[in-house]
């Protein structure tokens, strides 16, 4: 490896603001902010969504209608297809 070209890999605390959860992860992200957890100071980054708050991971998913787009089109505009102009 060449010296002085690789980013510094360190433990960083990511704060999921929507779930108010803190996650310690190894990262090369640059940040000026710091936070103290358990008597140790870590670099600190806020995020809006993580696995602690994303609906896919929490099980609070929206269910979508299984009706096809063609069927929805027919339902909305099907009466125009057979209509006479004039």
UniProtKB/Swiss-Prot annotation:
Entry's Gene Ontology cellular component terms: ribonucleoprotein complex; ribosome
Keyword Cell membrane: no
GO molecular function terms listed in the Swiss-Prot or TrEMBL record: structural constituent of ribosome
Taxonomy, superkingdom: Bacteria
Coiled-coil stretches noted in the UniProt entry, renumbered to this chain: none
One Pfam family here: Ribosomal_L31
Alphabetic keyword roster: Ribonucleoprotein, Ribosomal protein
One GO term of the biological process aspect: translation
Similarity field: Belongs to the bacterial ribosomal protein bL31 family. Type B subfamily.
Subunit field text: Part of the 50S ribosomal subunit.
Protein's UniProt name: Large ribosomal subunit protein bL31B
The organism of origin for this protein: Salmonella paratyphi A (strain AKU_12601)
Source organism phylogeny: Bacteria, Pseudomonadati, Pseudomonadota, Gammaproteobacteria, Enterobacterales
């Amino acid at each position: 490896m060449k010296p002085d070209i690789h980013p510094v890999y360190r433990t960083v605390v990511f704060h999921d603001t929507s779930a108010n959860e803190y996650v310690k992860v190894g990262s090369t992200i640059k940040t000026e902010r710091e936070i103290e957890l358990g008597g140790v100071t870590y670099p600190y980054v806020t995020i809006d969504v993580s696995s602690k708050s994303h609906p896919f991971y929490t099980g609070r998913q929206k269910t979508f209608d299984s009706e096809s787009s063609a069927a929805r089109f027919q339902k909305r505009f099907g009466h125009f297809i057979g209509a006479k102009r004039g």
